[in-house]
UniProtKB/Swiss-Prot annotation:
The keyword Ligase does not apply. One of its GO terms (biological process) is electron transport chain. It comes from the Bacteria. Pfam families: Fer2. [2Fe-2S] cluster binds at residues 41, 46, 49, 79. This is Ferredoxin-1. Its cofactor is [2Fe-2S] cluster. Residues 4-95 form the 2Fe-2S ferredoxin-type domain.
Length: 98
């Protein structure tokens, strides 16, 4: 099992870096680290937890909400995203999807 550095940039521009194992969803790791990120369904079926991937790679094959264009644009649902490298994600991006 690998552990990656996940850097989260919130709506105010505050940057927090956490450790996230490759078998743990980014949202879950953030909560364990004491961060308060938006979420609703926790199943990849809505957009409440949406973020934007700045650098790195993730596996969000469990998500069912984002369309191909949104995925290609870098949007990520943190509730069903596993890191596959060190990543930087801008959080609180639900409004940008619409």
């Amino acid at each position: 099992m690998a552990t990656y550095k996940v850097t989260l940039i919130d709506a105010e521009g505050t940057t927090t870096t956490i450790d996230c194992p490759d078998d743990t969803y980014i949202l879950d790791a953030a909560e364990e680290a004491g961060l308060d990120l938006p979420y609703s369904c926790r199943a990849g079926a809505c957009s409440t937890c949406a973020g934007k991937l700045v650098t790195g790679t993730i596996d969000q094959s469990d998500q069912s909400f984002l369309d191909d264009d949104q995925v290609e644009a870098g949007y990520v649902l943190t509730c069903v995203a596993y890191p596959t490298s060190d990543v930087t994600i801008e959080t609180h991006k639900e409004e940008d999807l619409y």
